Amino acid sequence: MAERGGAGGGPGGSGGGSSQRGSGVAQSPQQQPQQQPPQPQQPTPPKLAQATSSSSSTSAAAASSSSSSTSTSMAVAVASGSAPPGGPGPGRTPAPVQMNLYATWEVDRSSSSCVPRLFSLTLKKLVMLKEMDKDLNSVVIAVKLQGSKRILRSNEIILPASGLVETELQLTFSLQYPHFLKRDANKLQIMLQRRKRYKNRTILGYKTLAVGLINMAEVMQHPNEGALVLGLHSNVKDVSVPVAEIKIYSLSSQPIDHEGIKSKLSDRSPDIDNYSEEEEESFSSEQEGSDDPLHGQDLFYEDEDLRKVKKTRRKLTSTSAITRQPNIKQKFVALLKRFKVSDEVGFGLEHVSREQIREVEEDLDELYDSLEMYNPSDSGPEMEETESILSTPKPKLKPFFEGMSQSSSQTEIGSLNSKGSLGKDTTSPMELAALEKVKSTWIKNQDDSLTETDTLEITDQDMFGDVSTSLVVPEKVKTPMKSSKADLQGSASPSKVEGTHTPRQKRSTPLKERQLSKPLSERTNSSDSERSPDLGHSTQIPRKVVYDQLNQILVSDAALPENVILVNTTDWQGQYVAELLQDQRKPVVCTCSTVEVQAVLSALLTRIQRYCNCNSSMPRPVKVAAVGSQSYLSSILRFFVKSLASKTPDWLGYMRFLIIPLGSHPVAKYLGSVDSRYSSTFLDSAWRDLFSRSEPPVSEPLDVVGRVMQYVNGATTTHQLPVAEAMLTCRHKFPDEDSYQKFIPFIGVVKVGLVEDSPSTAGDGDDSPVVSLTVPSTSPPSSSGLSRDATATPPSSPSMSSALAIVGSPNSPYGDVIGLQVDYWLGHPGERRREGDKRDASSKNTLKSVFRSVQVSRLPHAGEAQLSGTMAMTVVTKEKNKKVPTIFLSKKPREKEVDSKSQVIEGISRLICSAKQQQTMLRVSIDGVEWSDIKFFQLAAQWPTHVKHFPVGLFSGSKTT
């Protein structure tokens, strides 16, 4: 609650009112009906909480809360008949203090054993057995769950001046509270409190005088409707001597019927059923601090009218249509009853009006939409870890051009709109010619499993917003493979972009790099999928062939597969390996997009969950082989970290990932330094030469399947790679929108480069990763000077290889460097920078200069199996003159040294990198996936959840942790 309740004290009280946070309502004496005789109070309904009583004075109660303002609670209390100060007069019987209080406390949804229940308590009498405090003229009765911060207090109860007193009460507490089924944490505390005082002045806060405990588990099993005496003790340890007693009239704990409540009250948002227990009490931010709940109720009914007006406009089905099958059955039964024709009426429909028929047709349309959204399969799209695309969209103007950029808030809406426009002919003649060539290749392959989704894959590319007249498609048609249809999508999918190369490249550049490049017009006018590579995949649907391959592997709930091989088939290398494995009937799943990777891993996690439910023994780790580039492994890592964050830590041992590199792969290179058998299998020259070609070989030069299965069968040891965190602050395309943040896990290398405005060329080296992010240069590339020097002095971290080559771009307006400010903190006081830097490791260190490149690695040193808790950074700077700045390491200049110098800083626990000029946007590559329009980013050496390591399988004889 955002405001303090304005409740006043009873007659003769302090008059200060309740100072606790909450909301209350008080009725004036003129509006109250005649007082009824005392009787047990029923629990107040959650929505229309109302209490009536009669008296010359009333006051409101407040629900105290010390939690955050995001949780909602409401307390309604009416007090009457408070005894006057000084006790009752002669011959008069004091009227009982009457109050009705209601509150809703939040439920811990992370625990499956926590359920909401409604607790009702009626207090009849307060007996003070001992004098607890001098000058005690008023007390407050409060209830609180043990271990919780929420407190529900009554108004001040005025006590007579005499010491030992009996006060008649008629207090009713109705609490919706979280009940834990599997632990002893259901103790309700009934406390006797008074206002705190300082030098005879009342101050904020309450002092607890006595406490009594009620076991809610016993109340749930044995409700009490008779007289019950609860002793209150000033010392919890000494329960033999009570200082006060409270007589309880009724005591009960009842379950909450959410279905009955929701059948009477309409939902107010499309996704209200996601959290059905608490959403019924939610108000908008403007009304959360209101002291008048009736005002909130009026707004609720106004919102009901608005929903009726907008019924025809809102066609998005709520998430309950996906997750709750009983609702669909109820709708269907209700519709069948409406269509049932009685014998008296006959078969004539003349009495049915057109309006009724139109209303039934609308209901049928909504039902069909619900049935289409609901997918009962165990490995279907409902298990995907995608962002919510069914939330209420912000009103925005539709872009004039279909392929132009949208903000991330509009990407969700556009993804739904694109589904309805799959049949539109929006392709240009050049695109049609390219698509015809691709389609002819598919027909030649005679692949029946792919013919059903030809149209879907073409339109999926349109949904990425990256189709243009310069799309490089015909080059890939040279190589007809089984899954060659995915190449069309591979040239546009941003999660598979492994470099920043453009079509104007050297002939020595591998075909894979040229095919995965994007034209300049696309990079400058692309959609949000370029800025956020995983946003564009929310519109995709996994192909039918993916589910067919999964069904062949996941055959039974009683047994788990020993291994699953995931292959990235967006390029010829993956298609080549997949075809060889499929010929020998290996458990292969061909994936072409991030959403398909998520679908496969979701199905695997679901099957592991079913196995655990059916078996008492722990499952053995399932080997998941990832055949592809570093960016492909990054998509698997992101889903792994996100999915297992909501599961218990023992799930971290249920899967073991096997990395099979196709092309340059920094993580695989580190694994080869730890495991010599792994290095000889996947890092030898024969393997590299095979997959660095521009086209697949005519004959098989080496036993690819034998090497893969040798690794799959022999990887019996788990090596834990630490998972680091990258927080990216991205700029929206629209200037009036605020920036947003993305949290990306990574295990390899993060590289920083300048946003290019012109085409650039890329050198090709065997040791440099394909994903090397380049900085524009005003000089032509030099293969003999700069790159060699950048990695020679001082020796860089072996895990970073030699990917510090500076690539030139003569037309770049920024020159060959970028001004950056890098703030970093060292992890341990004992770790210092190389070359003997003596600065304090616990303080912030800053590098502020012009950089040619910045690269941060989370991988340990080559050959070191011992994991470190820090990162290593390699920077290449440009020297303005012969004088070395004080912030850099001092060294003697070489004779043939160019105007750059390399520096390695180790032991970094946290790092923040930003451009010197605010208008300069950065481009960041994280484990091979490129992210653009970055204002600044922050790196942390450890991922914040319990998923802190990525389990990788190695051969048994390797040096593992």
Swiss-Prot record:
One of its GO terms (biological process) is protein localization to plasma membrane. Changing residue 757 to G: In mouse mutant chicory (ccy); reduced proportion of B cells in peripheral blood. The modification Phosphoserine is found at residues 28, 377, 379, 428, 493, 517, 526-527, 529, 532. Residues 1-70, 76-95, 260-297, 375-426, 475-540, 758-802 are annotated as: Disordered. One of its GO terms (molecular function) is transmembrane transporter binding. Residues 351-375 form a coiled coil. Residues 35-46 have a biased composition (Pro residues). The modification N-acetylalanine is found at residue 2. It is found in: Golgi apparatus, trans-Golgi network. The keyword Ribosomal protein does not apply. Disruption phenotype: Mice lacking PACS1 have reduced numbers of B-cell progenitors in the bone marrow starting at the pre-B cell stage, normal numbers of developing T-cell subpopulations in the thymus, and a reduction in splenic follicular B cells. ER Ca2+ efflux in PACS1-deficient lymphocytes is defective after antigen receptor stimulation, while ER stress and sensitivity to oxidative stress are increased. B cells have reduced IP3R expression, and show spontaneous loss of quiescence evidenced by increased proliferation and apoptosis in lymphocyte-replete environments in vivo. Residues 20-34, 51-70, 768-802 have a biased composition (Low complexity). Coat protein that is involved in the localization of trans-Golgi network (TGN) membrane proteins that contain acidic cluster sorting motifs. Controls the endosome-to-Golgi trafficking of furin and mannose-6-phosphate receptor by connecting the acidic-cluster-containing cytoplasmic domain of these molecules with the adapter-protein complex-1 (AP-1) of endosomal clathrin-coated membrane pits. Required for normal ER Ca2+ handling in lymphocytes. Together with WDR37, it plays an essential role in lymphocyte development, quiescence and survival. Belongs to the PACS family. This is Phosphofurin acidic cluster sorting protein 1. The gene is Pacs1.
